[in-house]
From Swiss-Prot:
It holds the Pfam family tRNA_Me_trans. Gene3D superfamilies: 3.30.300.10, 3.40.50.880, HUPs. The lineage of its organism: Bacteria, Pseudomonadati, Pseudomonadota, Alphaproteobacteria, Hyphomicrobiales. SUPFAM superfamilies: Adenine nucleotide alpha hydrolases-like, Class I glutamine amidotransferase-like, GMP synthetase C-terminal dimerisation domain. The active site is at C86 (nucleophile), H176, E178. This is GMP synthase [glutamine-hydrolyzing]. ATP binds at S230, G231, G232, V233, D234, S235, S236. GO terms for cellular component: cytosol. Its EC number is 6.3.5.2.
């Protein structure tokens, strides 16, 4: 689905910063639609979107190097407000006649900003004479301002830390307002959008829903769509949105690989078939998957087998249905943003959904991706708008390869059943304790290790179960969840008493980094 020109849009020009997506998050949180466009195609992006405001991102590049990225001149000729962040501030200054030099003292981490002049961007937030914490990450710095600019705030190593040309509505900051380490950063971005650019902030999920439904109808017409439904939030929301648009022209296929959580496949089928009247084909392919996986211990080999078998199974079932012209996917915005190489051309790394990668080309289908403009939290909000229950929307992430990567070593049907039961008990205890929503992800792992135990009067030699729970904002970094010992004791006792095949339970206290959230 292609975003057409809309009056209240913010264009974010990406110069390759690792935190550009955070800028987009802050703009969306302010109720305003935005798009990230790499600097190489920013000229075309500006003409396509006709934005009400532009934000220039940071970059690992240096403005003083020959051939470093620049913003297209059309931005400065257009008269729209511009907000330059870090590198964005520096290139704006250079392009408008100022100077930038490599800093004598690099500034990374927390810094303090001294406000020495009132500014329209500070309204209701900062005032002259106040001091505020910000987050710096720069080596270069502005040393001479273009005509029309003035300094409104400084830091110890950045005499031009916050600059403004109030007449042209150009603002530049040396720090990063988009990160949480700048406490007032989101409000500054909000002030720029609402007060300076005059954008109302009325972009909502209900408005997006109506626009997306119409776009799907325009794209699909009277043709057929098939959608791979995994039971996850992304594919489920995409399927419901497509179904709302084209009704019975959509058929969903749930490939049950035998690696799902306890009763998960049955619950997904019941919810979508009974409550949403969605045409859903449930394919039990567990014998096929587990048969090929049995005895395979290398995690990457497991993933490849699962991916290959999924494509083969999905393709076979789709052909039985007579094929379709369109394939529905739950692709999200972070998956389609182009990564930027500031030393050459754009490096486009569009990820394929782990389950359906390669399918559109193999089956000669066009993609329908109604979520490709949304972040994960926005997809959850849209799911709520579509009527999905909170218990479903708020589910913890679950990997595509399923329990196969939570069973290190060789896989057998027996080990999967042991793990499935232990995992269900663990999650049940978490819900009973009221902890589910406080945890990003929690699951059990069945280790390829057996230990001696004593149950009753008998000796046992059974598997070890590891419990994992982490807190996180985005899954990129994570900390282990700090349970009290009473909870862990209760969960361990239930698992050992109720699951035949486990006689020892341990808790994983590894953070990410150095570990990963999943064990494989």
């Amino acid at each position: 689905m292609t975003q057409t020109a809309q009056p209240d849009t913010v264009l974010i020009v990406d110069f390759g910063s690792q935190v550009t997506q955070l800028i987009a998050r802050r703009v969306r949180e302010a109720g305003v639609y935005c798009e990230i466009v790499p600097f190489q195609s920013a000229d075309a992006g500006f003409k396509r979107l006709q934005p009400k405001a532009v934000i220039l991102s940071g970059s690992p590049a240096s403005t003083v190097d020959e051939g470093s990225p620049r913003a297209p001149q059309i931005i400065f000729d257009s008269g729209v407000p511009v907000f330059g962040i870090c590198y964005g501030q520096q290139t704006m200054c250079m392009q408008l006649g100022g100077k930038v030099e490599s800093g004598h003292h690099r500034e990374f981490g927390r810094a303090f900003l001294d406000v020495n002049k009132d500014c329209a961007l500070f309204e209701g937030l900062w005032s002259s004479g106040s001091r505020h914490q910000v987050w710096m990450s720069h080596g270069d710095r502005v040393t001479a301002l273009p005509d029309g600019f003035e300094v409104v705030a400084t830091s110890s190593n950045a005499p031009y830390a916050f600059i403004a040309d109030e007449k042209r509505k150009y603002y530049g900051v040396q720090f990063h307002p988009e990160v949480v380490h700048t406490p007032d950063g989101a409000k500054l971005i909000g002030n720029f959008i609402h007060n300076i650019a005059g954008i109302k902030g009325d972009w909502s999920m209900s408005a997006y829903r109506a626009k997306a439904v119409q776009a799907i109808r325009d794209q699909v017409g009277d043709k057929r769509v098939i959608c791979a439904l995994s039971g996850g939030v992304d594919s489920s929301v995409a399927a419901l949105l497509i179904h709302e648009a084209v009704g019975d022209q959509l058929t969903c296929i749930l490939v049950d690989h035998g690696l799902m959580r306890k009763d998960e496949a049955a619950n997904v089928v019941a919810m979508f078939s009974e409550h949403y009247n969605l045409h859903l084909l449930h394919v039990d392919a567990s014998e096929r998957f587990i048969g090929e996986l049995e005895g395979v211990s290398d995690p990457e080999t497991k993933r490849k087998i699962i991916g290959r078998l999924f494509i083969e199974t999905f393709e076979e079932e789709a052909k039985k249905l007579g094929g379709a012209d369109f394939l529905g996917q739950g692709t999200l915005y972070p998956d389609v943003i182009e990564s930027v190489s500031f030393t050459g051309g754009p490096s486009v790394t569009i990820k394929s959904h782990h389950n359906v990668g390669g399918l559109p080309e193999r089956m000669n289908m066009q993609l329908v991706e109604p979520l490709r403009e949304l972040f994960k939290d926005e997809v959850r909000a849209l799911g709520k708008e579509l009527g999905l229950p909170d218990s479903f929307i708020g589910r913890h992430p679950f990997p595509g390869p399923g329990l196969a990567i939570r069973c290190p070593g060789g896989i057998t049907r027996e080990k999967l059943e042991i793990l499935r039961e232990a995992d269900a008990i663990y999650l049940d205890e978490i819900r009973k304790a009221g902890l589910y929503d406080a945890i990003w992800q929690a699951f059990a792992v069945l280790l390829p290790v057996q230990t001696v135990g004593v149950m009753g009067d008998g000796r046992t030699y059974e598997f070890v179960c590891a419990l994992r729970a982490v807190t996180s904002v985005d899954g990129m970094t994570a900390d282990f969840y700090h349970y009290d010992m009473e909870f862990l004791g209760r969960a361990a006792t239930r698992i050992i008493n109720e699951v035949r095949g486990i006689n020892r339970v341990v808790y994983d206290v590894t953070s990410k980094p150095p570990g990963t959230i999943e064990w494989e």
